[in-house]
């Protein structure tokens, strides 16, 4: 949710902090600020609104000289969005500045204790308690490191902390518990950040902090300690993303760029994992014996990743002839799930840091289940805590609304199904070879789908003024409709719902009236006739229908409605891989017509790292 960046080195810190914060904007925020230590003095500037306003206010950082600093983009949890509640927060003495992502659960008790000791609070936030409490401990012991140790034993809850002290002009201190934070290693300079995108211009060598760790950064190096203050050797990861992968590259929005990157992203996620016509998952450590002995299979995810899981449920059940349960991570962790030794939990997550998903993973692991994660970010928390990891290799995804991460997750999940199916002997040769053939052809076929962008942009004009849009579909099309509906509502702010077509008569059809926009998905060939009957049904109530079907059924659908989008014919289980692109483009162009902030929709964050 919130974004953190910190720097210690030889360069002007403010310049690096502002650049890092701009690269963290996609995570969502309502205010931003930086604090810099120069000449033994902490200087701070923070403001409600965009980082651009902060940049202007500080004259591109020139008003805050110094080579040590921290920055923050805030997503309000305690206290309304305003200048005072924005981070960083300073201690009463002016010695400490703190940035924080997470929630300090016992902050009210701590605040009352500090007020009794004479501390006066300026904000409504839980974070200011950290600054004041650290100041209190430091005034008692006189040592930054010891004061930090006391602080971490006093606070309860989740936190990623970046802290600087006026008395230590070459020290940046960081701590992590249940909130993501990474370290960046440079030459005569070092960094902290919530996300690698903030650092990619400055370093490719990073390490992810683990829960309970404390890091002390200086120009010369980084020292990391565990909860018992024992030194920890961190594994370095080299980031192979190109700098321009986190730039718009001539596109109006990151979302459009990332939609158009999907053919290449799917090719990267799949091509190296298919050799000689067979799926080869060399990064999977499960033995054939373990695969055949699997008990229950769960897919656990949130948001769009959950919709990938819905598609995966249909496809895995077909390929494995086993029941697969799909669970929302936020529900799974509290549901007392029936999961244990021998069961497989497939965790799907883009960032590898989503709190609910991480908590569900830990709950399943505690009960003895094997964890296989499908994630994008190498070395992320979910990846590190899983028994097996299949990376999607999608590269950085900056727009809040996911596109290429969704597509690559689905591609990897299909490969996993084929691999398991071959080992278990449950997928027939004809289906297996057709799937492999069409997976390799997906990038080219997806490019054909994306070529309909101009047509979709024209259709979007008719939707832009609507208050409600309904999606309907059966089977795989229903799973796909959930994602189409989510994309539309999250970036265009139009109310949208997705319904299983067979449920229309059970209440939904009462919402259909003259002119109601209905997007009918009918790509799944075996159920095309039933899908057509549902189109007729809603048209009889006055619905204005946009249909999405395959090229094979285009003419039949045109007999019922003049607004038809098509996808090439492929093996039916792969149709959602093609069908999602027109829905993404439709949502994008509708939002564009409505003048919405497409890359950073209101009230949304890219990575949800608090409850």
Name each model-derived stretch.
Residues 1-248, 252-253, 261-296, 334, ...:
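Conserved short alpha-helical segments that host acidic/polar catalytic motifs at enzyme active sites
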Residues 262-266, 270-298, 388-517, 591-611:
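Active-site phosphate/pyrophosphate-binding segments
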Residues 289-441, 521-526, 530-565, 586:
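Glycine-rich phosphate-binding loops that contact phosphosugars or nucleotide phosphates
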Residues 544, 570-611:
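Generic C-terminus detector
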């Amino acid at each position: 949710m919130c974004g953190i960046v910190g720097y210690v080195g030889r360069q002007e810190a403010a310049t690096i902090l502002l650049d890092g914060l701009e690269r963290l904007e996609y995570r969502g925020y309502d205010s931003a600020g930086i604090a810099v230590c120069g000449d033994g003095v902490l200087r701070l500037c923070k403001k409600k609104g965009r980082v651009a306003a902060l940049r202007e206010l500080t004259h591109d950082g020139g008003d805050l000289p110094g080579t040590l600093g921290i920055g923050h983009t805030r997503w309000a949890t305690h206290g309304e969005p305003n200048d005072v509640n924005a981070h960083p927060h300073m201690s009463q003495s002016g010695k400490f500045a703190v940035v924080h992502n997470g929630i300090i659960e016992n902050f009210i008790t701590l605040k009352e204790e500090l007020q009794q000791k004479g501390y006066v609070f300026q904000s409504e936030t839980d974070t200011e308690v950290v600054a004041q409490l650290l100041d209190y401990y430091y005034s008692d012991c006189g040592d930054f490191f010891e004061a930090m140790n006391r602080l971490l034993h006093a606070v309860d809850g989740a936190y990623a902390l970046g802290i600087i002290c006026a008395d230590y002009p070459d020290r940046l201190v960081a701590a992590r518990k249940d909130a993501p934070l990474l370290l960046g290693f440079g030459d005569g300079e070092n960094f902290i950040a919530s996300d690698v995108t903030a650092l990619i211009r400055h370093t490719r060598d990073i390490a992810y902090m683990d829960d309970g760790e404390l890091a002390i950064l200086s120009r010369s190096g980084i020292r990391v300690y565990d909860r018992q203050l024992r030194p920890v050797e961190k594994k370095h990861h080299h980031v192979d993303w190109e700098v321009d992968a986190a730039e718009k590259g001539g596109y109006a929005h990151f979302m459009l760029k990332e939609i158009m990157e999907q053919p290449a992203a799917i090719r990267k996620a799949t091509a190296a994992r298919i050799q000689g016509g067979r799926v080869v998952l060399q990064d999977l450590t499960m033995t054939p014996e373990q695969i055949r002995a699997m008990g229950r299979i769960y897919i656990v995810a949130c948001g769009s990743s959950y919709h990938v899981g819905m598609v995966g449920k249909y496809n895995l059940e077909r390929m494995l002839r086993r029941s697969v349960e799909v669970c929302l991570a936020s529900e799974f962790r509290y549901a007392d799930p029936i999961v244990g030794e021998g069961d497989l939990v497939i965790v799907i997550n883009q960032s590898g840091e989503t709190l609910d998903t991480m908590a569900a993973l830990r709950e399943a692991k505690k009960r003895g289940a094997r964890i296989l994660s499908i994630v994008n970010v190498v070395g992320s928390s979910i990846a590190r805590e899983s028994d097996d990891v299949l990376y999607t290799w999608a590269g950085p995804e900056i727009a809040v609304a996911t596109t290429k991460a969704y597509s690559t997750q689905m591609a990897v999940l299909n490969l996993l199904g084929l691999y398991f199916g071959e080992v278990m002997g449950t997928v027939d040769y004809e289906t297996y070879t057709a799937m492999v053939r069409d997976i390799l052809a997906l990038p080219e076929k997806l490019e054909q789908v994306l070529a309909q962008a101009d047509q979709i942009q024209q259709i979007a004009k008719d939707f832009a003024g609507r208050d409600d849009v309904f999606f309907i579909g059966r089977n795989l099309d229903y799973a796909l409709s959930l994602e189409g509906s989510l994309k539309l509502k999250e970036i265009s702010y139009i109310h949208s719902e997705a319904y299983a077509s067979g449920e229309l008569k059970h209440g939904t059809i009462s919402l259909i009236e003259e002119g109601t926009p209905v997007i009918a998905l009918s790509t799944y060939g075996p159920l095309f006739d039933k899908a057509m009957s549902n189109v007729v049904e809603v048209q009889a109530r006055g619905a204005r229908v946009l249909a999405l079907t395959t090229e094979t059924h285009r003419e039949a659908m045109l007999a019922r409605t003049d607004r038809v989008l098509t996808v090439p014919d492929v093996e039916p289980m792969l149709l959602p891989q093609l069908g999602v692109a027109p829905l993404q483009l439709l949502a994008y162009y509708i939002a564009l017509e409505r003048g919405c902030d497409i890359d950073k929709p209101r009230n949304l964050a890219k990575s949800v790292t608090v409850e």
